[in-house]
Amino acid sequence: MRPELSDYEHISAGKVREIYEIDAEHLLMVVTDRISAYDFVLDTDIPDKGRVLTAMSAYFFEQIDFPNHLAGPLDDERIPEEVLGRAMVCRKLDMVPFECVARGYLTGSGLKEYEATGAVCGVKLPEGLVEASKLDEPIFTPATKAEIGDHDENVGFDVVVKDLGEDLAERLRTATLEIYSQAAKMAEEKGLILADTKFEFGLDKEGNLVLADEVLTPDSSRYWPAEGYEEGKVQPSFDKQFVRNWLTGPKSGWDKNDGSQPPELPGSVVEATRARYVEAYERISGKRFADWIGSCV
């Protein structure tokens, strides 16, 4: 459900976020409680999910040593009360048309590509790697930004160079890996493994690279508990994998390959998913989510 904000013009929508124009220089980014899986936006919301993602992004924007798009505090007077705690005032940027992905461990689409080719996005990897293998060094694996309902497509670094030029492509790769390394160290100190993550960047009027959108949330990242980590096994996670597993399990009755809309999630799955998101925020930040501003809508 899209928030109706009479003071601002709604200019775009994503799977989870709604964007409104404040003025010529600023946007209001509102994070809803929607959840997506397998390129579908589900009919069931996860209560407080938007607030958790906003809280976590705000925490990391403060901690990470890199320019970001925030243009005001989280209780900025320009944020309407009904979206307080799930909205940010952001600078307008010229957004880079690639997802910038850093992988420190092999899993997900990266594992599938490796099993087929021995490489991920053109980066050759050693033989014998398996599910959850730790890579010798984190790798940069960009992807195209897909429209709602389409798949992001992993691409090689050469594609980024061709589209954006060598200088900007190299800046993106360097920034992505540096930020990932900062965040992975922070996660490790909290007993978590940051397996992989994706960033979005934009350019300001001076051509400076700026970290934008969300950062290091359970929607954009794979966090695993360090305790019990074992190479070769699927790791428990603090993201929406729990929802994916239910959708593809026998209880849902849904076939992800037939093009039909996924079924509504049962209450137990909704509650467990919310709990995972909240736990991720609290473990990373050391703060209580109950103290975060705003209320569930």
From Swiss-Prot:
It is an enzyme of class 6 (ligase). One of its GO terms (cellular component) is cytoplasm. One of its GO terms (biological process) is 'de novo' IMP biosynthetic process. The keyword Nucleotide-binding applies. InterPro entries: SAICAR_synt/ADE2_N, SAICAR_synth, SAICAR_synthetase_CS. It catalyses: 5-amino-1-(5-phospho-D-ribosyl)imidazole-4-carboxylate + L-aspartate + ATP = (2S)-2-[5-amino-1-(5-phospho-beta-D-ribosyl)imidazole-4-carboxamido]succinate + ADP + phosphate + 2 H(+). It holds the Pfam family SAICAR_synt. Gene3D superfamilies: ATP-grasp fold, B domain, Phosphorylase Kinase, domain 1. GO terms for molecular function: ATP binding; phosphoribosylaminoimidazolesuccinocarboxamide synthase activity. Its EC number is 6.3.2.6. This is Phosphoribosylaminoimidazole-succinocarboxamide synthase. It comes from Corynebacterium urealyticum (strain ATCC 43042 / DSM 7109).
